[in-house]
């Protein structure tokens, strides 16, 4: 939420930008679960936003309670890879609504680098259909409010396996889910390998029931500065993966074999923040000067699989001796080190949600 005031002899206005309530949910359907995040409480196909029951999310917590996590407002924002970084498109949608309200050219002081970055970003375009989010605005005297709201549930057709204490991320035990081997054909249909070099460099895709959306997970030893750099790398490697599949010697990398494992941490958080580096920023039109009084955003995200509870612990051994790279061997695609998650439309180049995972702060613990 932003308030904007005019200064000196120029007309004074206040602008509230409410970058609000972003719900992202990736959770399986369960036949006897009762109402929860799994439920889509609407039969109206024309409804602009899917109604997700909020009680499945934890209570809102201020970002200051998460010292190892940061929010970013654009894909072009620089990320601190030693911390978790959370991005969602609602901030850009709300700012775009402000520009529509002002509806005339304006200037931003070059010292306001965050606001300039927000204003120049175009990575929000076409990442969601118009009926998948709500943009609203209100003008009350000299006060202007702009709000962007987005709620989305991505459910899976079939439960994946749930592993209690089955994963160590940076040597800390966390709850996890995934698949092991080829024992359940319905589970295999949910997971695709888009790129595989080795157990530390790969991309997988999770297929929700809504085939217009996809969940991409990327583990890499390469260093990145921005999420759009990560996205560009993913696009490039997916092309490489398609080429690899045509090579008879290595196409085994793209099949899930009997001894393969895919294990992913569970996430459950509901975080709000005020962007202090946007507070007090100004931009000027010919006759008006606007000052941002408050910029607020809340993002809630669940990535969780309620499959059969299995008491097991994954141990991974890494071998240093040279091996034939073309010889099939078990793939251990285990997200136990920093990695990237993004949610996007299948036909869109850019994601509407991105999460750089550097530590366990946002993960579910048992």
Predicted regions and their residues:
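Conserved GHKL (Bergerat-fold) ATPase module
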Residues: 17-21
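Generic hydrophobic alpha-helical membrane-segment signal
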Residues: 13-16, 288-290
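C-terminal motif of bacterial Sec signal peptides marking the signal peptidase cleavage site
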Residues: 24-25
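Hydrophobic-core positions in well-structured secondary-structure elements of globular domains
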Residues: 31-366
């Amino acid at each position: 939420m932003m308030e904007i005031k005019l200064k000196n002899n120029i007309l004074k206005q206040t602008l509230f930008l409410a970058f609000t309530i972003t719900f992202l949910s990736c959770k399986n359907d369960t036949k006897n679960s009762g109402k929860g995040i799994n439920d889509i409480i609407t039969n109206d196909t024309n409804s602009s936003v899917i109604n997700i029951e909020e009680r499945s999310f934890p209570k809102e917590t201020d970002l200051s309670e998460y010292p190892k996590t940061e929010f970013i407002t654009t894909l072009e924002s620089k990320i601190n890879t030693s911390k978790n970084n959370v991005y969602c498109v609602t901030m850009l949608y709300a700012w775009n609504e402000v520009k529509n309200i002002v509806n005339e050219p304006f200037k931003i002081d070059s010292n306001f680098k965050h606001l300039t970055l927000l204003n120049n970003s175009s990575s929000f375009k076409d990442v969601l259909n118009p009926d998948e989010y709500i943009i609203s605005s209100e003008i009350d005297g000299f006060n202007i409010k702009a709000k962007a709201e987005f709620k989305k549930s991505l459910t899976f057709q079939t439960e994946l396996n749930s592993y209690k204490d089955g994963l160590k991320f940076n040597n800390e035990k966390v709850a996890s889910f995934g698949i092991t081997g080829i024992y359940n054909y319905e589970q295999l249909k949910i997971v695709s390998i888009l790129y595989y070099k080795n157990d530390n460099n790969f991309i997988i895709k999770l297929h929700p029931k809504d085939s217009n959306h996809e969940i991409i997970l990327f583990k890499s030893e390469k260093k990145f500065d921005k999420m759009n750099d990560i996205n560009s790398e993913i696009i490039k490697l997916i092309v490489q993966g398609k080429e690899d599949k045509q090579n008879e010697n290595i196409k085994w990398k793209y099949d899930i074999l009997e001894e393969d494992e895919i294990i992913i941490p569970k996430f459950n958080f509901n975080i709000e923040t005020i962007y202090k580096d946007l507070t007090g920023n100004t931009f000027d039109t010919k006759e008006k000067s606007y000052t941002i009084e408050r910029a607020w955003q809340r993002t809630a995200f669940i990535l969780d699989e309620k499959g059969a509870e299995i008491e097991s612990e994954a141990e991974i051994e890494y071998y240093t001796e040279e091996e034939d790279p073309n010889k099939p061997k078990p793939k251990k695609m285990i997200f136990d080190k920093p990695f990237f998650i993004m949610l996007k439309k299948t036909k869109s180049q850019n994601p509407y949600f991105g999460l750089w995972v550097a530590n366990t702060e946002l993960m579910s613990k048992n």
